[in-house]
Amino acid sequence: EPIKSYRTGQVLFDRLEVTRTDNDEDLIVWDMLAWYGGDRNRIYFKSEGENRSDDGEPAELESAELLASRLIAPFWEIQGGLGTRGSIASGAERENYLVFSLFGMAPYRFEMDNSLTVNEDGDIAVNIEAEYDIRLSQLSYLQPRLEMGAALTDAEEYDRPSGFNNVRMGLRYRYELSRELAPYIGVYWSRALGDKADRVRDQGGDESEIGVVVGVRMWF
């Protein structure tokens, strides 16, 4: 039974990594969340983004979200709030949106974060993230990870056509130096899909990417 009056919090960097791609690009990537509250009700802040080295461009914010969360079943929370994404450059036009998420652990201990966003123009997008920890020893884990993005409507202003837009699969090996600190290494593969892939090719870009990552998972 959840403890109604208990309040605590956590800051977790699930991914804080340096990436080297098959196009000889270097990236710094972060994926973090912070929360405060009890077992039933919490406030979350989530952020993901990347910065490509030596391209002269500011970091790209994939998402920054402030969410209210409610426990609706064992291991499952429903969340709702506000978010933004885009360049972090001063004065940059960012996409602001409402977000609704189903966040928790599926059977067989798959960690899920499924979200639906609606921006100021009414454009609807869906993002699915799943990861799973395979314990190799008391201190080491192998973690496969899957992420998919799709749009239910065309969002021309943000170069996001309707349909499935991208898929990303990764595999990381991490070793826990302590409960709070675990360095890791890994690889990933990502690919644009459907009309998004056609647009990337038309613009002279690569529709797929492979990368090697070195990073650390930590919380406090």
Protein language model regions, located:
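Repeated loop/turn-to-beta-strand initiation elements of outer-membrane beta-barrel proteins
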Residues: 39-45, 74-79, 108-114, 137-142, ...
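Detector for outer-membrane/organellar transmembrane beta-barrel domains
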Residues: 91-155
